[in-house]
Amino acid sequence: MKRILILLLAVFAGISAQGADAPKQRPNYDLASQFSAKRISQMVFSTELTPNWFRDSDKFWYAWKTPAGTQYWIVDPETGTRTQAFDMEKLAMEITAITRDPFDAQHLPIEGMKLKDDKYLRFDIKGTQEVPDTLAQKRAERAKKDGDKAPKGPQKPPMTKKVWHFQYELATGQLTEYKPEKREYPAWASISPDGETGVYVKNSNLYWMDRENLAKAVEDEKDSTLVEHRLTSDGIRQWGFGVDNYSGDTETDTTRRVMARGIVWSPDSKHFAAVKTDMRKIKDLWVINALSQPRPTLETYKYQMPGEPGPTEELYVFSMPDGSSKRYQVNAFKDQTFDVSTRPRKFRETYDKYRSRVWLGDNDGFWLVRGSRDLHRMDVCRVDLASDSTRTVVSERMNTYIEDRQIHLINGGKQFLWWSERNGWANLYLYNADGTLVRNLTEGAYHVEDILAVNEKEGYVLFSACGVNKDENPYQMHTWRVALAGGPIRQLDMDDMNVEATASDDGRWLVGNCSRVDYAPEAWLIGRDGKRKLLDKADLSLLFAAGYKMPERFKVKAADGITDLYGAMYKPFDFDSTRVYPIIDYVYPGPQVEANNIAWSKGMVRTDRLAQVGFIVITVGNRGGHPNRSKWYHNYGYGNLRDYGLEDQKYAIQQLAGKYDFIDGSRVGIHGHSGGGFMSTAAILKYPDFFKAAVSCAGNHDNRIYNRWWSETHHGVTEKVEQSDTTFVYHIETNPEIAANLKGHLMLVHGDIDNNVNPANTIRVVNALIRANKRFDLLILPGQRHGFGDMNEYFFYRLADYFSEWLLGDSERGEVDVKELNND
């Protein structure tokens, strides 16, 4: 033990001495500019395969783009064959002849590809020919009918580019034009399974139309002959059906027809369930759009903060066609949430003229999941229509928050599959419908992520899980099979890879998108027996030709010296092993995800690209950061949401700096967005002698004013029961409280109309820093929401400037023009 302590002291002493007299280093903006999001999009194309399954077979088609253009393929899993859907050269010539616009095989702008009757591929081509814009004309005519002011004098009809609609017969290769079918149903209607009825909301109340009138509404929603039937009359603004939870402008016009939130139908179309929501106690929040013309505008939206009164929800079931309704008592907890479970969507339903949301159950009742506000209690319930009863089938209880997944009914509804973390790991359980546990389908110290498919005929379940292979990165997802009768689980895909899989409706075939942070993406066909066939691989040749190098994986210990943490290191592509580089930690604390990339991604602006300026950039997990490990790991930060991940991040950097001579452990930066903005500011304030610079974007610095669900769920809320009433008390440490600790250099960044993390979060830190007499930097991005929109590229160079100045000792901050933006 004494020898280990001496070694650690020597390592950390060396870290402190490394950068004491570090010379100025010129930032490499030119290299960073070569890997902008725009330029990456010109070098890297398809990285993920999306199968478009046929309706009546296990075949599927997909598109794959490379520097040579886009190819369309049809895969027959049964025969293991992959054939080209088109002869692209021939197709381009045929389309050129018809449209009179020149195209070739590499430049054929196919849009909206869809399969028709498993026999035809339909798609659109936008040409250059100008034609009257009939849609714009109809809109103008409707506006005139509604009394809107029309321009005076003769008006030229609006024009648009002609869109050609083509149909390609797979069997013969014949190309023809086709006329698109008219829509039969308006987008705002929730359509019954038999297609005969559509339910919607108007004036906070429910209405319905029959099929004939729905078709008329598609043509003209304001047709005076439309016949609609009113189902409810007691709905009012913010207390009615179709009320949107937690978002939306409170000034929205309620007289128009809109989709009813939460409508789910019985399989026989004779009933539907609907949720009536009371949002009146939810307070308003605002952002001001300073760029609105001619005057700035106030945007108002509902926003519940931690500890505040919540919405209440009531469940009603309506009978059709008489429209009678009954309220069902499903409440067990104050301010509870509940969701009526729905039947899983099938890929073959993609080709239906409409999609119905059908409840999970039968014509006599359905299943729902309800949870207490603190999410310490969760129930799986069965609602029975005839007896007007709600029966609790499974109860989950835990001292931290409970998560869940979709219920899967099997055996004609007599049994179901349920996902639970009750033993500290996410596993699958088979239950009888009466709540009797039949067996654990999985029971290992690993994380089951989700069910991919159930094949009852052959008696197995396909699911995704990680952490089974103990010699791998525990975040790497794999595809597994287990028998419904129980037994060992079987891996279907390859080792040491992250596999995100999609299963066919019958679960006989999967398409797995496979990669690692240091391995180019591949797409594989995977059989239920584990046999595999490579379909395509991302072409990164242009990226490598530009000098790109893969990041490097690493493993370190958490601050407890026991828990393994996993990360990725991004070096400059012109890396010089004789140099010493500052290190920047790109962070997101979780708890729903970590910043650490497991799979390869072309979204590399804040990692690979930032490194090119002249830094070592890392991402690494921390205890409390990710749900795909043990429940202990995931919930480590419960009750300590500000500080829980900071010590691990600091200790990880110290270990890397002690191991690698090219890392200067005295020049440490930290950067993050949203939760990462919150974390990076907390880090420089909590460890002011370690972190020298931080750039914090859109941070929820004061979680007392961030959204109720995220804050209360991941930090915890105290229920107080007094005199038969329950209240909710929330307390959390915030960044403004420790602003006086600032010693390093901090830049705060926020979009001024961010309606996710309100700008007040950053303004409160600004106020605290000013009150503490601190110098800092603030960048407000006008007209930008949470993600910074079209100012992301500008922000990158401000990010590069800041870290260059304070970690490299040089930057372009003295220059007014961002010349790289002008040259991109």
PLM region spans:
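Intrinsically disordered, low-complexity segments enriched in Ser/Pro/Gly/Ala and basic residues
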Residues: 15, 268, 723-726
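Beta-propeller folds
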Residues: 18-500, 506-521, 525-526, 813, ...
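Hydrophobic h-region of N-terminal signal peptides that target proteins for export
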Residues: 9-18
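Serine-hydrolase catalytic core recognition
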Residues: 51, 284, 355, 363, ...
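Sec-dependent signal peptide recognition
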Residues: 2-7
